[in-house]
Amino acid sequence: MDGAATKFFRPWESHGSYHHSLPSISPPDSPASTSASSSSSSIGANELTTKRRKCERCTCPNCKAIKHGDRGSQHTHLCSVPGCGKTYKKTSHLRAHLRKHTGDRPFVCDWFDCGKRFDRSDQLIRHKRTHTKEYRFACKFCIRQFSRSDHLQQHLTSVHNIVVVD
């Protein structure tokens, strides 16, 4: 060794920079708005706030880190909606989950007059296959074709009595 300082990658040192603006659900201001929002199936736009999360060794409310200093540390992001309790390893997955609570569906099908909306882009991509008739999975025992592998597996089990093991 030549005595030069070696710089090691320490992901826990830059943990605070990992957090982006996450929407968090805040409770309604008055009891009247609570009764009004309880009849609605989605949370109103006035109840959704965006905050910049300052994280000092994983003290942000949406992140619970396990095993500090370990390269294999896992970050669990907790949904802030009371009574939900769902956790995610990635901030983006938590953000997508929060759309379920807010009813936000930013991904819109642009196929002619369809206009269906989705809260995740992968759902939109899968939906577009219904318009294009794209069948990527074919049954080897009959002529049926499917756009999703899980539908093919369900077909094999129910029609041909074949259990597919992954």
Curated annotation (Swiss-Prot):
Q: What happens when the gene is disrupted?
A: RNAi-mediated knockdown causes hypodermal or cuticular rupture, typically in the anterior body region. Abnormal gap between the outer layer of hypodermis and muscle and the internal organs, perhaps due to defects in cuticle integrity.
SUPFAM superfamilies attached to this UniProt entry: beta-beta-alpha zinc fingers
- One function term, GO molecular function aspect: zinc ion binding
Pfam families on file? zf-C2H2 (PF00096)
GO BP term, example: regulation of transcription by RNA polymerase II
Q: Where is this region: Disordered?
A: 17-45
**Has the keyword Zinc been applied to this entry?**
yes
PROSITE patterns the UniProt entry points to: ZINC_FINGER_C2H2_1, ZINC_FINGER_C2H2_2
Residues in C2H2-type zinc fingers run: 77-101, 107-131, 137-160
Bias (Low complexity): 31-42
What are the protein's UniProt keywords? Metal-binding, Repeat, Transcription, Transcription regulation, Zinc, Zinc-finger
The role this protein plays is: Transcription factor. Probably acts downstream of the Wnt signaling pathway.
**Which family does this protein fall into?**
Belongs to the Sp1 C2H2-type zinc-finger protein family.
Q: What is this protein called?
A: Specificity protein transcription factor 2
Species of the source: Caenorhabditis elegans
